[in-house]
């Protein structure tokens, strides 16, 4: 039992020993902490002293760094400023050599470097650089001038004085353009000079102010006009005809070939311009390049117009053809380029005005010709003005497209009032749509044709009443001949489908002519009328018994019947004789013969049936039996 207390004491002693050890360590730690705190205090004091000393040194160091950087920048700037001056001699050698020897790319790069150096020097504004800047300006101007000369030489080398346009037209070949190599070189030169020009001249500059653009127009413009000059002259020369009175036929003038060549040349030139210049340059430069050729076109059209006005009867159709050709040219060029429409309209205007005036002037001229006639054929023969007028209308059908356009601009019936001269016209060119011949276009033209025919017939009718001395019959023959010729020339030509709805205009004149011619026939027929007394028995129907009828007549009545036969014979023979002397168209002779036969034969046959026994077959009073007079009627056809 003694073991328990001993163990407990032993444990207590160990615990006290451990506590003593811990206390000893804690005391050492406390002493160490105090030492560290003392060191920290001393270190803080030392650091403060260091900061007080190092602060000013750090500020000075930073200032020195900034100063050093500034010095480096100044040295770099000076180096850059010295570089152009140092390289000027090298660039000057390239500039003096020119783009041909130095190579275009190398030459352009040299000028660009000089320009950049000049900009840098101008930005520095150092007085020491003024002389160098002046030398750079001189070199740049010299370089630009040589580039312009290079452009000029390249373009002239590729531009012949002229080409033969018919070679390309007849072989259906495209007109030549500049070679791709030259286009590339010309484009490089233009790109640099135009950019430089606009930078120096400011925003107010226009494309045509560019020296390169002026050079291009000055070289290519004469090339265009020289190439087209012969065709322009040919257009004027082909107006001369062996027979001055011959009517103009479509396509016989050179204006169509001239316009075709102009279109091909202009479009090829526009392609050149688009390949070399920037978009804003295309339109103005194209206008400037074509200016000389357009002036020649305007002069040519004025000469053609003067010729047309002097030969309006025969050559008005040329005005219609020119109107259509030039309108097509304008439309094609506008579609491809958007240019020259107003210039072409101004050039075409004199011819188009003449074309408008011609429609009314032709009617007036026909009236004047009829009024000036002093005589007409006394046999009723047709006169040339009828066929000439219809031939004019036939020819107009060949130019129906431009004529329809012109008539639209005048308005239906506008040719009567010379609407073309009322000041409404402007420098406008008709579009291709206006040349589309629809129902309205054909209707207006047919209206013009009917006006022409009506005016012609009215004029001939009035003149015939004054001039023809052979009475109503010859006037009827004259009018009927005219009607038949008009009808025939309509029926046998392209006028037929256009005027099929207006042929009634001729029916009234045919009816009038027939009425005038058959007036004499009616007078002849009066001798075949007898008087039936109502107090006597009505004649039996059917075949009359001439002997029985005559038995019922008094001697006086028989003498009257004999007189009627004799009067009929005389007037009938005279009418037949006159009929055979008249100069009639075949259709007219048949028409009038038929009218005479239908009017007289039934009356004569009736009269003969009733009274032929009046001279008892001796033929003294009754000259014709029914078969004999029928034979006479047949000779009238």
Locate predicted features.
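Long alpha-helical rod scaffolds of large eukaryotic non-enzymatic complex subunits
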Residues: 1-637
């Amino acid at each position: 039992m003694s073991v328990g207390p001993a163990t407990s004491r032993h444990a207590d002693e160990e615990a006290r020993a451990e506590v003593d050890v811990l206390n000893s360590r804690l005391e050492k730690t406390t002493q160490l902490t105090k030492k560290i705190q003392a060191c920290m205090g001393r270190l803080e004091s030392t650091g403060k002293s260091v900061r007080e000393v190092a602060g000013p040194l750090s500020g000075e160091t930073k200032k020195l760094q900034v100063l050093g950087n500034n010095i480096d920048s100044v040295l770099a700037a000076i180096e850059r400023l010295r570089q152009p001056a140092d390289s000027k001699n090298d660039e000057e050698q390239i500039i003096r050599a020119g783009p041909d020897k130095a190579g275009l790319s190398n030459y352009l790069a040299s000028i660009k470097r000089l320009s950049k150096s000049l900009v840098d020097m101008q930005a520095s504004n150092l007085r020491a650089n003024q002389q160098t800047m002046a030398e750079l300006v001189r070199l740049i101007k010299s370089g630009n001038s040589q580039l312009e000369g290079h452009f000029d030489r390249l373009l002239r080398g590729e531009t012949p004085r002229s080409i033969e346009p018919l070679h390309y037209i007849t072989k259906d070949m495209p007109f030549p353009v500049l070679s791709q190599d030259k286009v590339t070189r010309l484009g490089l030169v233009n790109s640099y000079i135009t950019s430089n020009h606009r930078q120096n001249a400011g925003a107010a500059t226009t494309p045509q102010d560019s020296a390169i653009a002026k050079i291009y127009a000055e070289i290519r413009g004469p090339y265009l006009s020289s190439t087209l000059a012969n065709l322009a002259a040919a257009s004027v020369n082909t107006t001369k005809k062996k027979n001055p009175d011959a009517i103009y036929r479509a396509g016989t003038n050179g204006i169509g070939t001239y316009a075709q060549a102009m279109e091909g040349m202009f479009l090829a030139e526009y392609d050149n311009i688009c390949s070399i210049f920037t978009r804003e340059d295309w339109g103005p430069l194209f206008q400037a390049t074509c200016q000389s050729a357009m002036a020649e076109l305007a002069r040519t059209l004025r000469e053609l117009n003067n010729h047309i006005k002097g030969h309006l009867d025969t050559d008005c159709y040329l005005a219609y053809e020119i109107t259509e050709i030039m309108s097509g040219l304008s439309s094609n060029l506008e579609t491809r380029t958007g240019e020259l429409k107003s210039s072409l309209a101004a050039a075409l205007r004199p011819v188009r005005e003449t074309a408008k005036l011609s429609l009314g002037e032709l009617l007036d001229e026909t009236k004047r010709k009829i009024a000036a006639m002093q005589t007409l054929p006394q046999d009723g023969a047709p006169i040339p003005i009828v066929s000439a007028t219809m031939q004019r209308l036939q020819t107009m059908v060949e130019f129906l497209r431009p004529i329809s356009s012109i008539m639209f601009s005048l308005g239906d019936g506008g040719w009567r009032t010379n609407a073309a001269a009322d000041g409404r016209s402007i420098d406008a060119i008709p579009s291709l749509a206006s040349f589309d011949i629809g129902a309205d276009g054909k209707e207006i033209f047919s209206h013009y044709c009917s006006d022409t025919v009506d005016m012609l017939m009215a004029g001939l009718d009035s003149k015939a009443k004054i001039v023809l001395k052979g009475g109503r019959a010859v006037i009827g023959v004259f009018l009927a001949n005219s009607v038949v010729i008009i009808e025939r020339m309509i029926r046998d030509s392209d006028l037929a489908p256009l005027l099929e709805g207006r042929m009634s205009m001729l029916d009234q004149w045919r009816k009038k002519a027939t009425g005038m011619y058959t007036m004499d026939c009616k007078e002849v027929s009066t001798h075949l009328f007898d008087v039936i007394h109502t107090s006597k028995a009505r004649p039996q129907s059917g075949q009359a018994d001439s002997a029985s009828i005559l038995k019922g007549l008094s001697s006086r009545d028989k003498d009257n019947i004999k007189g009627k036969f004799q009067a009929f014979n005389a007037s009938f023979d005279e009418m037949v004789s006159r009929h055979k002397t008249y100069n009639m168209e075949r259709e007219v002779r048949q028409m009038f013969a038929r009218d005479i036969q239908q009017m007289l034969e039934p009356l004569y046959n009736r009269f003969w049936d009733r009274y032929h026994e009046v001279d008892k077959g001796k033929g003294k009073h009754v000259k014709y039996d029914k078969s004999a007079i029928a034979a006479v009627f047949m000779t009238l056809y």
